[in-house]
Design a protein with these regions (language model features):
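CheY-like receiver
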Residues: 43-114
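Conserved acidic segment of CheY-like receiver
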Residues: 4-15, 20-24
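Conserved Asp/Asn-Gly motif in the active-site loop of CheY-like receiver
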Residues: 33-40
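Short, flexible coil/linker segments at domain boundaries that flank nucleotide/cofactor-interacting
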Residues: 2-3, 77
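Alpha-helical interaction/dimerization surfaces of two-component signaling modules
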Residues: 23-27, 45
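A generic structural motif
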Residues: 27-33, 78-80
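Conserved sequence signature across two-component system core domains
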Residues: 10-11, 36, 54
Length: 114
């Protein structure tokens, strides 16, 4: 049996997060195991779920996505890939420096998820 990959989405934009969730559900090997609307709740969710894949918005209401990544980096003891996800391409360099696995622009182009 193929491995089921656990996914968490941290994004304050409900429409974008729901749209991403809808697209990801089309892939049988992905399980959406949680969504959070801010960094504080996102951190708690990550500690609880231990996802394989994190879609992280760059600008959250309580902190930047990079700040959250810096806070949790030492606590991540499992293999988790991070996809930074934002409406602004100016953050691409921060994503790369932050060891992001990938980078997606909002609105999500479903062809970019392949």
């Amino acid at each position: 049996m193929d491995k089921l990959y656990r996914v968490v989405i941290i994004d304050d934009d409900e429409f974008s997060a729901d749209n991403l969730c809808l697209e990801l559900k089309k892939y049988n090997r992905l399980s959406i195991d949680g969504m959070a609307r801010n960094g504080v709740n996102g951190r708690k969710l990550l500690e609880k779920v231990h996802p394989d894949l994190l879609f992280l918005d760059v600008e959250l209401p309580d902190m930047k996505g990079m700040e959250l990544l810096e806070q949790i980096r030492g606590a991540i003891t499992w293999n988790m890939q991070i996809v930074f996800y934002t409406a602004y391409d100016k953050y691409m360099i921060y994503a790369i420096r932050g060891a992001a696995f990938d980078y997606l622009l909002k609105p999500i182009d479903k062809n970019c998820l392949l």
